[in-house]
Amino acid sequence: MLQTMKTLTLIPARLGSTRLPNKPLADICGKPMIVHVADRAAAAKLGRTVIATDSEEIFKVVAAHGHEAIMTRGDHESGSDRIYEALAKLDPSGEIDAVVNVQGDLPTIDPDTIRRALLPLEDGPADIATLGVEITVEEEKTNPNVVKIVGSPLAGNRRLRALYFTRATAPYGEGPLYHHIGLYAYRRSALERFVKLGPSPLEKREKLEQLRALEAGMRIDVEIVKTVPLGVDTQADLDRARTFCSQAGTI
């Protein structure tokens, strides 16, 4: 049954990227990347959209472009920890039911894709929801940077119940492989539990934070979408985002 959920969209952002310094403020067609992400997250209309950052520079830039930001501590080990602090500050009375965590390096993400991340929480029993795309490029099947989802099909193959996430090529045998998109929607209680657990053995081995939830018995459902949004981790990725923007006239 479809639930009516009070939702908060949070975008964690920090300046500490080693591969691409000052990444959130990188210019794409005259606008900082973090602002492109905020524009698209706001267009998804999943409640209030707030950037959670430890950088006063990011805070000021975001505010200058008309978006809301909140300062968080600088010692967080993950974006999940940062958004939990932001949630506690923004909603101390506990009125928010679900939190959508949009990564700050997805400047081309479709607002509809963001909306779809919430669906497994609205119409199913999942604790956490995320996104996946069927892999169609052969090289991606063996690329450890393309995280694969091992899961059981649900809802006519448009959704998976996640059993595992891995950098290896899995599952073995005939059939589709799915690329995990690191955008999450959490029930509030699930986020609270998740950040209190601490890193798990498989999480540390695979370097995949979502395995912490699975090892603790939490349910993650994956909504299957059609395209992978461009994630900006390197200068080459940034160049692609700029090319996309210049060709499209806008992101």
UniProtKB/Swiss-Prot annotation:
Protein family membership: Belongs to the KdsB family.
UniProt enzyme class: transferase
Main location: cytoplasm
Alphabetical UniProt keywords: Cytoplasm, Lipopolysaccharide biosynthesis, Nucleotidyltransferase, Transferase
Gene: kdsB
Protein purpose: Activates KDO (a required 8-carbon sugar) for incorporation into bacterial lipopolysaccharide in Gram-negative bacteria.
GO cellular component terms listed in the entry, alphabetical order: cytosol
Pathway: Nucleotide-sugar biosynthesis; CMP-3-deoxy-D-manno-octulosonate biosynthesis; CMP-3-deoxy-D-manno-octulosonate from 3-deoxy-D-manno-octulosonate and CTP: step 1/1; Bacterial outer membrane biogenesis; lipopolysaccharide biosynthesis
Subcellular location: Cytoplasm
GO biological process, any: lipopolysaccharide biosynthetic process
UniProt GO molecular function: 3-deoxy-manno-octulosonate cytidylyltransferase activity
HAMAP family referenced in this protein's UniProt entry, alphabetically: KdsB (MF_00057)
EC number, UniProt record: 2.7.7.38
Descriptive protein name: 3-deoxy-manno-octulosonate cytidylyltransferase
Record carries keyword Nucleotide-binding: no
Catalytic activity: 3-deoxy-alpha-D-manno-oct-2-ulosonate + CTP = CMP-3-deoxy-beta-D-manno-octulosonate + diphosphate
Top-level taxon of the source organism: Bacteria
